[in-house]
Amino acid sequence: MPTGDPMSRARPEVVELETALPVPAAEAYAWHERPGALERLLPPWEDAEVLERTGGLADGSQVTLGVAAGPVRLRWVARHRDTVPGAQFTDEQLDGPFAAWTHLHRFEDAGPQASRVRDRVEFIPPFGPAGRAASPVLRRKVARMLRYRHATLRDDLAAHHGIAPLRIAVTGASGLIGSALVPFLETGGHTVVRMVRSRPGPGEVYWDPSRGALDPAGLEGIDAVIHLAGENLAGGRWTAERKRALRDSRTKGTRLLAESLARLARPPRVLISASAIGIYGDRGDTLLDESAESGTGFLADLGRDWEAAAAPARDAGIRVAHPRMGVVLSPRGGALARLLLPFRTGLGGPIGNGRQWWSCVSIDDAIGALHHAAVTPALSGPFNVTAPEPLTNRDFARTLGRVLRRPAIVPVPAFALRAALGEMADAALLASARVVPGVLGTTGYRFRHPTVEAALRHVLGR
C-alpha cells in the first residue's frame, strides 16, 4: 500500500464472515449494483441513512452516509475500488468516524445455482492509541453488522430468485413498511413507482386523496399496486375528529385509487390494499385465521370499511388482496421503537395484566408477504401478516427482556394507559387478537422469522 495509507502504518483490526447464498455469484453481485442495496444492508438498530451516491460500484464511485455518533451526526464518505464486475468490490473510507476503514466484498460460485459471499473488514479505531481500547467493542459491532447483512442478503436473494421483474406502484412509500419495501423491491430487479403528494419527480406519480386528485396516466401498464398509505393510528388521542381523519385517510384514499385503477385501459393485475388485524376486535384466546368473522369496535369497523373501499378494483376484474398487518417489529418505528427505551433501562414489562395476545411480525416478513402477494396469482382476499406463533403480551415482554438481557417485570397499569390514551389503550394495547397466517402458509410463503424471538434478534442484532 502507499506510505500515505493509514493501513500501512498501523496494524488494522480484521473482521471476516463467509455465507452460502442460493444463487450464482453474478446474481448476488447484481443485487448489490441495484438501487436500494445499501438501504437494505444498513442495520435497523443503527441511526444511519444514505445521503448521496454516484456511479454504482465502479472504481471511483462514492457513497455518503449520515451516521450518529452519540449526540453528533457525522458524514461517512466511502469510495469504491478494486471492482471486478460479477466478482468483487471494495469500500474505502475517505472521511468518517474511523482512522481507516476498508471493506472487501467477494462473490464466488459454489455450484450451478449457489455461491458464497466473503466479507473482510479492516479498520483502525479513531483517537490513536487511546482508541485501541475500544477495539473489542468495535469488532463485536462490525461482526453484528456483517451477520445482519449476510442474513438479509441470503433471504432477499431467495425471495427474488426466479421472479420476473415487475413495475410496482407503492403508496405510503415513506412510512415504516413502505420505506423498507421499496429498496427490497428495487434490489430484486423490480421498477418501483412511488405515489407522492408533492410535485412528482422521475419515477413518481402525483396523488392527493384529501383532494380526490390522482394522475392516472402514470399508472397505465403498471403490473401491481401496493397501497399502504393511511394516517398513523398511534399519532394522537382518538378524539371524534381524529377518528374521522383515520377513517377518511384509509377509505377515501383506497376508493380513489380503486376507482382510478378500474378506469385504466391497461389496469394492473393486482391491487394489494392494506388492512390490519384490528378488524378481528378483542377476541380473547380464540385462534383467528382468515375465515374468522370480523369483530366489534372502532378498529373492526374501520377495517371493514377500509377493505370494502377497494371494491371498484375488484369489480373491474383486478385481483385484490388485503394484508391484515399485525404488530410490525422494527426499531425504526412502531410499537417496538417505543418500547426499547424503557426495556433497555430495565423499566419494561407487561402491559395491563399481560394476558392479551399480541400477533407480531418482523419488518422483513411484512415486506416479504407483500411481495409474495404481488407475485402469487392464487392469493386474493384477506390474508393475515403475522408470525405463525402468536404470544401473550406478558410473553412478549419476557422475550424482549431476554433478547436485551434486561429484566422485564415492571408492568404498565391498564388504568394509566386509559388515562393517557383513552379508547386507543383498550383497542390497540389491551385488546387480545390471537391471529395466525393461514393463507400465507397455504400459498407457500416461507417465514424468515417464525417466532417473535427470532424477529427481535434479527432487527436488534442480538
What are these regions (language model features)?
Residues 338-361, 365:
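A conserved pocket-lining segment of Rossmann-fold NAD(P)-dependent short-chain dehydrogenase/reductase
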Residues 166, 376-423, 457:
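Mid/C-terminal beta-alpha module of Rossmann-like enzyme folds, strongest
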Residues 1-58:
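Hydrophobic ligand-binding cavity/cleft-lining segments
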Residues 206-253:
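NAD(P)H-binding glycine-rich loop region in Rossmannoid oxidoreductase-like domains
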Residues 275, 308-331:
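Conserved beta-loop-beta element that borders a ligand/cofactor-binding pocket
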Residues 316-318, 329-338, 373-383:
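Glycine/proline-rich active-site loop of Rossmann-fold NAD(P)-dependent oxidoreductases
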Residues 5, 81-82, 90-143, 227:
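Beta-strand/loop substructures that line and gate deep hydrophobic ligand-binding cavities in soluble
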Residues 243, 255-297:
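Conserved Rossmann-fold NAD(P)-dependent oxidoreductase catalytic core, especially the SDR/UDP-sugar
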